[in-house]
Curated annotation (Swiss-Prot):
Highest taxon, organism lineage: Bacteria
Positions of transmembrane segments: none
HAMAP family: Ribosomal_uL4_B
Species assigned in the record: Nitratidesulfovibrio vulgaris (strain ATCC 29579 / DSM 644 / CCUG 34227 / NCIMB 8303 / VKM B-1760 / Hildenborough) (Desulfovibrio vulgaris)
Annotated family: Belongs to the universal ribosomal protein uL4 family.
CC per GO annotation: ribonucleoprotein complex; ribosome
Subunit organization: Part of the 50S ribosomal subunit.
UniProt keywords, alphabetically: Ribonucleoprotein, Ribosomal protein, RNA-binding, rRNA-binding
Protein name: Large ribosomal subunit protein uL4
GO biological process: translation
InterPro entries in UniProt: Ribosomal_uL4, Ribosomal_uL4-like, Ribosomal_uL4_dom_sf
PANTHER family, per the entry: 50S RIBOSOMAL PROTEIN L4 (PTHR10746), LARGE RIBOSOMAL SUBUNIT PROTEIN UL4M (PTHR10746:SF6)
């Protein structure tokens, strides 16, 4: 059972918190993480790419010159794939890249991602962020004090002041426990859990 120190926004110790081993101390299997990240990335794809086959390209219905007697190579259409401006054969067509991953596997992957951050000493628990106003400069100073570089911050609920203060800082992202994803955890080098969000994360994944 992992006992982790809790810090305030000035990097001063503010207590300790016990993290559930079934959520934060799971054996990491790269193939599971890879599968879930691939599924999440595939779901983001628009799949709107399209090329014109001979069925869709305009023109080319008339034979450009007679079959014999011209000395030129025979041709049946100006929209042959061999011609400039011609059709594309076996080119990409609109499609849906999404594929299903079982809910149990998705939850397991989230537990593994959280465990990897704890095992790599890249998990930080903070008491909270006290921001009197929307001020990027103010949060940038807090991030510098906490040593945050490329970090995902999990807040207990949506906080407009915090979100607006963070959005212009490269590499730092805010999310709630409901928005937690394997891709976002692995994409960011550090994971910052606001103390109030720990229980929600654990309840969701137990």
């Amino acid at each position: 059972m992992a006992v982790v120190k809790v810090y305030d926004q000035n990097k001063q110790e503010a207590g300790e918190i016990t993290l559930a081993p079934e959520v934060f101390e799971v054996e990491v299997r790269p193939e599971i993480l890879h599968l879930v990240v691939r599924a999440q990335r595939a779901a983001f794809r628009a799949g709107t790419h399209a090329t014109k086959t001979r069925a869709f390209v305009s023109g080319g219905g008339l034979k450009p010159w007679r079959q014999k007697g011209t000395g030129r190579a025979r041709a049946g259409s100006i929209r042959s794939p061999l011609w400039r401006g011609g059709a594309i054969i076996f080119g990409p067509q609109p499609r849906d890249y999404e594929f299903k991953v079982n809910k149990k596997v998705r939850k397991l992957a989230l537990r593994m991602a959280l465990s990897s951050r704890l095992a790599g000493s890249n998990l930080l628990v903070v008491k909270g962020f006290e921001l009197p106003e929307v001020k990027t400069k103010l949060f940038a100073k807090i991030a510098d004090t906490l040593g945050l570089d490329k970090a995902l911050i999990i807040a207990p609920e949506e906080n407009t002041t915090l979100a607006l203060s963070v959005r212009n800082i490269p590499g730092i992202t805010i999310a709630t426990p409901e928005q937690l994803s394997v891709y976002e955890i692995l994409k960011h080098k550090q994971l910052v859990l606001v103390e109030g969000a720990v229980a929600s994360v654990q309840d969701r994944l137990k």
